[in-house]
Curated annotation (Swiss-Prot):
Domain of life of the source: Eukaryota
HAMAP family in the cross-refs: SSB (MF_00984)
Pfam families tied to this protein: SSB
Domain SSB, first and last residues per copy: 30-142
Presence of the UniProt keyword Mitochondrion in the record: yes
Protein name, entry field: Single-stranded DNA-binding protein 1-B, mitochondrial
Record's GO cellular component terms: mitochondrial nucleoid; mitochondrion
GO MF terms, alphabetically ordered: chromatin binding; enzyme activator activity; single-stranded DNA binding
Amino acid sequence: MFHRPVLQVFRQFARCQSTDSLSAILERSMNKVQLLGRVGQDPVMRQADGKNPVTIFSLATNELWRSGENEVFQPAGDVNQKTTWHRVSVFRPGLRDVAYQHVKKGARLLVEGKIDYGEYTDKNNVRRQATTIIADNIIFLTDLRDKP
């Protein structure tokens, strides 16, 4: 019953304890992002020469905090808000098409995926950095029939 999970844990432990350089390459790591927010614009689908198409949209997340004394316990005080905008890219063929057809401005979504930092050259031949969330899963929290 526990043989398989124990073996997996032992293998991970053995990799961490080994001084072999190959084991460092096999070490587990994680790049996981979960965002809960609202869509800022209807998605667009882009396709670069010879590459797979991608659906892209922006997602806003908000942080709220109360300023003033006794921030946690007092209802008085100013409520502050910070909005962060995230660029979401969807490459998976089935999910990409669903996102393009059904994600709408104002919709509330839960997006799961990974964060990616990349570089590109703009039309003025200037190198730019771009951060994007590569979506693996999208959960619609707004009814697709509702207009947000």
